[in-house]
Each structure stands twice: as structure tokens, then as C-alpha cells.
Amino acid sequence: MYPAHLLVLLAVCVSLLGAASIPPLPLNVAQFDNMIECANYGSRPSWHYMEYGCYCGKEGSGTPVDELDRCCKAHDDCYTEAEKRRCHPKFSAYSWKCGSDGPTCDPETGCKRTVCDCDATAAKCFAKAPFNQANWNIDTETHCQ
């Protein structure tokens, strides 16, 4: 084999190894967003729930500040339980429908159903809970210890 071919082969292998270490984007984020908007009939965009209280958003800690924040904590806990069962909630695509009573999971089994149930329950909980503007984008360092 020619040295140039070896260099090309080495470059391909190195680039594949590098690509393998890049984490994939969450697949079900769009599904969960759509479920939230289905449950609340489009009255509040899903991004409003991203920086709410101590648990709605990236990571949660402390005591939930209200009912809506408790919904987010329950969703986090549901994902934690799914992970214990070797499911990957943020990367599990599932099937569901939006009906007059909100989101409903299709009859799937295993991880897809588990994650779908977590998201549907949370979306319905969000729709029922009041949104307190004072708890949006709070200082989590102060309020969530």
C-alpha cells in the first residue's frame, strides 16, 4: 500500500472517531414541545416552561416553587426512572396523537411507551397548573437550594 493511501485511511479513521464522540441532539424535544402545545391548546408556547421555577429547564434542585414546578420535578423523576430501566428519554422517538383531551400515546411498549407516558403526563400537568410570571426566570442560586 502506498504511503498516501495510508494517510488517507488514517485521516478517515481519525475523523470517524471524532464524530463518534459528538453527542447526538435530543430527538424527542420537538415531540414534547408539540405535546405541551397540544395539552394547553396552544395558549402558551412550550419555551415558556424552559426557565420556570427550580425544575423546569436544564437541571433541577431544591424545593419546587409551585404546582407547575412540581410538574417539572415529576417529569424529571419520570425520566430518571426511565433511565434506570436503560431507556434514553431524550433520544426516544415515540408515536402519539393530539385529541380533544390532550396528548395520547399510541399503543407501543417498552422505552418508547415509558417516555411517551412521561411526556404526556407532564404536558397535561403543565396545562392544569397556573403559570406564575414571578416564578419565570428566577435566580435559581437563591431560590432553589
UniProtKB/Swiss-Prot annotation:
Disulfide bonds join C38-C98, C54-C144, C56-C72, C71-C125, C78-C118, C87-C111, C105-C116. Binds 1 Ca(2+) ion. The active site is at H75, D119. Keywords: Calcium, Disulfide bond, Hydrolase, Lipid degradation, Lipid metabolism, Metal-binding, Secreted, Signal. Expressed by the venom gland. InterPro entries: PLipase_A2 (IPR001211), PLipase_A2_Asp_AS (IPR033112), PLipase_A2_dom (IPR016090), PLipase_A2_dom_sf (IPR036444), PLipase_A2_His_AS (IPR033113). Its EC number is 3.1.1.4. GO terms for biological process: arachidonate secretion; lipid catabolic process; phospholipid metabolic process. Its cofactor is Ca(2+). The keyword Ribonucleoprotein does not apply. Ca(2+) binds at Y55, G57, D76. CDD domains: PLA2c (cd00125). GO terms for cellular component: extracellular region. PLA2 catalyzes the calcium-dependent hydrolysis of the 2-acyl groups in 3-sn-phosphoglycerides. This is Acidic phospholipase A2.
